[in-house]
């Protein structure tokens, strides 16, 4: 199974497809609940890759939120309440963004991203995004 996943990752990487996947197009949560948004990373070097998280509110620019390089290198935002956290699961090649104590102003589309090396240099590659709706 690991060999198949590695082979698929390499093929997708070679053709420039599917490096990142956010499987949920949208999620809906109530105010004061928590949400987890996942990003599957199809890269053979996941353990050495920093995963960056952004959000874009309606009619606004992208906002950089947080990154995670290793599972022990989380950078929580929001002080003691840990409003936003990011983590990595090496077994599933997945990064998870957790947003706690949701408020209406958290409503946005959330994106994971990684830096990829191409012949022309480094470029940031984004997943499709997951829209968070807070009711």
UniProtKB/Swiss-Prot annotation:
Span list, region J segment: 117-135
GO terms for biological process, alphabetical: adaptive immune response
Chain segments annotated as transmembrane: none
Gene3D superfamilies per record: Immunoglobulins
Record-level GO cellular component terms: external side of plasma membrane; T cell receptor complex
Keywords per UniProt: Adaptive immunity, Immunity, Immunoglobulin domain, Receptor, Signal, T cell receptor
Domain of life (superkingdom): Eukaryota
Miscellaneous note of the record: This mRNA was isolated from a cytotoxic T-lymphocyte. The gene corresponding to this mRNA is rearranged specifically in T-cells and its organization is similar to an Ig gene, with V (or V+D), J, and C regions.
Location of the region described as V segment in the Swiss-Prot/TrEMBL record: 19-116
Keyword Signal: yes
PROSITE patterns named among the record's database cross-references: IG_LIKE
UniProt keyword Signal present: yes
Signal peptide: 1-18
Protein name: T-cell receptor gamma chain V region V108A
Pfam hit, one: V-set
